[in-house]
Amino acid sequence: MSPRRSVCWFVLGQLLCSCAVALQGGMLFPKETPSRELKVLDGLWSFRADYSNNRLQGFEKQWYRQPLRESGPTLDMPVPSSFNDITQEAELRNFIGWVWYEREAVLPQRWTQDTDRRVVLRINSAHYYAVVWVNGIHVVEHEGGHLPFEADITKLVQSGPLTTFRVTIAINNTLTPYTLPPGTIVYKTDPSMYPKGYFVQDISFDFFNYAGLHRSVVLYTTPTTYIDDITVTTDVDRDVGLVNYWISVQGSDHFQLEVRLLDEDGKIVARGTGNEGQLKVPRAHLWWPYLMHEHPAYLYSLEVTMTTPESVSDFYTLPVGIRTVAVTKSKFLINGKPFYFQGVNKHEDSDIRGRGFDWPLLIKDFNLLRWLGANSFRTSHYPYSEEVLQLCDRYGIVVIDECPGVGIVLPQSFGNVSLRHHLEVMDELVRRDKNHPAVVMWSVANEPVSSLKPAGYYFKTLIAHTKALDPTRPVTFVSNTRYDADMGAPYVDVICVNSYLSWYHDYGHLEVIQLQLTSQFENWYKMYQKPIIQSEYGADAVSGLHEDPPRMFSEEYQTALLENYHLILDEKRKEYVIGELIWNFADFMTNQSPLRVTGNKKGIFTRQRNPKMAAFILRERYWRIANETRGYGSVPRTQCMGSRPFTF
């Protein structure tokens, strides 16, 4: 690497190393209440990529000091969305480095003049590094592409007459061995093959590294003394539901808290006062997963009211599901009853939008999950939007909540620098998602090279840290390492195993699946005596490609492979296998390679959500299992999801 190039990337690294200074404290989902206002900044933003050789021109020329359009040509960029697929420019689709977003807005006069009001800027997802300015003044930086961060901008907007409000966000999608997910920048130095300075981003995960503002950017207000955080855990004592709460208030030490728990009909069923306490709910309605109860996903509302001697008030309402989770040697229990994960793995991925949040797509996906008879999914391989988890709470879809620890394959990615960042990511993930009843387990990684010696200490530390953050949920990671070589498996509560028998090896030989899968399960259980989830399995199928006898990439081969897996899963779920998650719910985009024809085709639905033959095979299976394991009458093919209109 040339000295100049080394200096450029060193400067970039210095900028990025500071990206963990976002607002500390709670991370309650922003919503309108009697004391809080919300302004959503979705829509068209000004956008430009920094194509300079060192990618630092925007910082060197301080693009944030004036409107972005004055720095040079800009594009209209929709937010939320990935920037990659919006234009016809291949250079932008594959761009690595800094891109710049900007949006101007008008604030209500009361926000800028009411000194009893606090104004907060929240970015729900900026992939991967982000630096944020308001009216040219630096307000926050953040590392990590899938979790929200905030900045209190009250002083900026209330410091004097405000004629304009301009938000500038610089985002860098460069991945290093120490990021989550990791990656490397590889320079191609052969002058006979590559132009000077040519580089590519190398990644060890099989999905496209979409980038941009993937979720909403919002402004919201609170009183200057405000409810900062709420933590809820639940338990059951016979037929009495127990709701334990802890509330954090910022801005003053002088306040009173009143807590009310309301049922779905709006009736108050319990009251409390103070920062912490326990609410007892006689004859409680429990939160049950979809297809496990005739009235699944029952949600109470926890209403918190804070008042101060100065007559300042703050209100916040949190949906609460009363349920318990436990793990034995061979069972996963929800409310004391065995639960079988009959579900899918997903991606936040769609045409044009990339990883951008999209309500129509989200509702379509949930309707397909219910049609399928699926009761669960894993957020492979990163945290999904909060709106996804809110719908899971409402619909009774159980979630294995996974952090972006995918592609951890290099020895340096198991060092102290990576571990420190990984611990911070789990802090952020648990802080955001701790109150969702649908979240029943944390996953700290997917397919790490956990046979490496440092992996033992790494996962022991990481899992212990996650358990300390949340003692109420089991912790796992998803492995594709041999059972007798996995250094992290001793520390998980549930074994999650990925295997692609007759796909990535023994190509086309469906006849070996049953023997190999039986051996897989028996070896893992014999060594660890823990329940097992088949966390990934599947085969690529090009929609409309048919071959009989089945051949690879045909829909027939995909269904035949699934059916061979199902024969053994049916045997082992009577013993210690507690779930199966197909890979994947829908086709999704990947990097270009000879092994991928416009992405990964292992979906049982196409990227446009049209079913392949495998979707009908899986639907028949999941509804059969639901009827076999039901604890009440015949399972209806459609279930009502609550009687009250639902708002987030």
UniProtKB/Swiss-Prot annotation:
Entry GO MF terms: beta-glucuronidase activity; carbohydrate binding; hydrolase activity; protein domain specific binding; signaling receptor binding
Catalytic site positions: E447 (proton donor)
Compartment annotation: Lysosome
Annotated glycan sites: N172, N416, N627
Gene name for this UniProt entry: Gusb
Xref: NCBIfam families: PRK10150.1
Protein name: Beta-glucuronidase
Reactions this protein catalyses: a beta-D-glucuronoside + H2O = D-glucuronate + an alcohol
Mechanisms controlling activity: Inhibited by L-aspartic acid.
SUPFAM superfamilies: (Trans)glycosidases, beta-Galactosidase/glucuronidase domain, Galactose-binding domain-like
GO cellular component terms, A-Z: extracellular space; lysosomal lumen; lysosome
Assembly with partners or alone: Homotetramer.
Enzyme Commission code(s) on record: 3.2.1.31
PROSITE patterns: GLYCOSYL_HYDROL_F2_1, GLYCOSYL_HYDROL_F2_2
Post-translational modification: Undergoes a post-transcriptional proteolytic cleavage near its C-terminal end, which reduces its size by approximately 3 kDa. The site of this cleavage has as yet not been determined.
Main function: Plays an important role in the degradation of dermatan and keratan sulfates.
InterPro entries (alphabetical): Beta-gal/glucu_dom_sf, Galactose-bd-like_sf, Glyco_hydro_2, Glyco_hydro_2_AS, Glyco_hydro_2_cat, Glyco_hydro_2_CS, Glyco_hydro_2_Ig-like, Glyco_hydro_2_N
